[in-house]
Amino acid sequence: SKLDDQVMIGHNCRIGAHSAIAGCVGIAGSTKVGQRCTIGGGAGIVGHIEIADDVHISGFTLVSKSISQPGTYTSISSTPFTTHADWLKLAAHLRHLDTYAEKLKTLQDKIKQLEQDK
């Protein structure tokens, strides 16, 4: 495994073979990180959880629960922790939130008008 500068690893942690951890990562105690994992800079991992083999954690992600499936995980900003693919969908939807709100308001107005016409 490769560790960058400023990496803090708590008590009783296990880091799997062939994993890479970038700078300023914090891993709390009794966490198990699988083999062939990468953890991006500034990420934080709470204690007493397990991370499966072949997991890739994006920089500045806060991992707050165990990860049992391989893949890339992202939790940037105030969005909930999720798979990277789901995070990308969420980010795309957030960009269109104003449009969705306008459409919803239009539908609500139409429903109100239909109810008044009865």
Where are these regions (language model features)?
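Glycine-rich hexapeptide-repeat left-handed beta-helix
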Residues: K2-K118
